[in-house]
Amino acid sequence: MTALPLYFDYAATTPVDDRVIATMLECLGRQGHFGNPASGSHGYGDNARQAVERARQQVGELVGAPAESLVWTSGATESNNLALKGVAQASDMGRRHIVSSRLEHKAVLDSLLELQRQGFDITWLEPDAAGLIQPEAVSQALRADTLLVSLMMVNNELGTLTDVASIGQRVRAHGALMHVDAAQATGKLNIDLRHMPIDLMSFSAHKTYGPKGIGALYVGERARGALHAQIHGGGHEQGLRSGTLATHQIVGMGSAFALAGAEQAAETARLGALSMRLREGLLNLPGVHLNGCATHRIAHTLNLRIERPGFNAAQLSSRLAVSSTSACNSASTAPSHVLLALGLSPAQALSSLRISLGRFTRPEDIEQALEVLESAVKAPPALW
């Protein structure tokens, strides 16, 4: 069997931690918590419901949110759809204006384009030269009819940060709602929704060493009653998301978020050192440049532009698992919309790589990656 390449695509997805798998197995099979959590007439349902609510508490503890403010979804894409379309469809105040940016994930961009087709007016903020959305730019975009502002906390392609707390204060003072996509932030940044002016926040398990197919949406007090369900049929999750709850996946998300909280400080320091070694080694190579702000970013993700004649990122695939764009766009050969928004040319965007580190990245992996990339960057261009 051909050996798999070294994994440097943690921003696309993370492997499920073995400790998380163990908790999920407790919910499968005849001896597990296999009951329907909505069945309150017997112990099977009670046990499953208790497991679900324990997981809800675990997620809430990581992000500083009351357990009852969290709605289970199938992932951050559904959470984003529920937040954006749910708020828009519930609006009866004549507010038809939404503010977002060109840097957002496709789950946000495409949802907003759909709302635009339905008659909503969308203001698309442009990033500054460092690839950041500044609070002042948001303030300037706010209007009397602004309903919602939606921005990501950590950019999935660049690893850059948005000051959502400062922006949220401005949005709240204006009387609009603030939604944040935090799929790339959990376990990496401190999030305390008790003290953040955020009304809606989207989460994903599979970006945090949990299973795919499960996520959550935080619905703050200001957003309650201002959200229309997108999936109907049973009134589950306070009427906001119908469907039988997947106990094993939910328990996996709770376990993953609990582990992320317990290990965040140590893991951030460890990955910071590994990332610095990788970054310094690569930026010393000819023609290699960092895309996005060098300071306001998480250590886990690097986006590098390699401007060398003949460099072909596809040649790396047998040795390194990296991305040239978001995983949701990888089937397309078009350049990254995020990199184009930064002002890069299509050729520059196509010569860029996203390298993302994670829990199972070892120091020796960094050294091997440096060897592979140095060889690829310095290789002479092909003559045919």
What are these model-derived regions, one by one?
Residues 1-384:
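Pyridoxal 5′-phosphate
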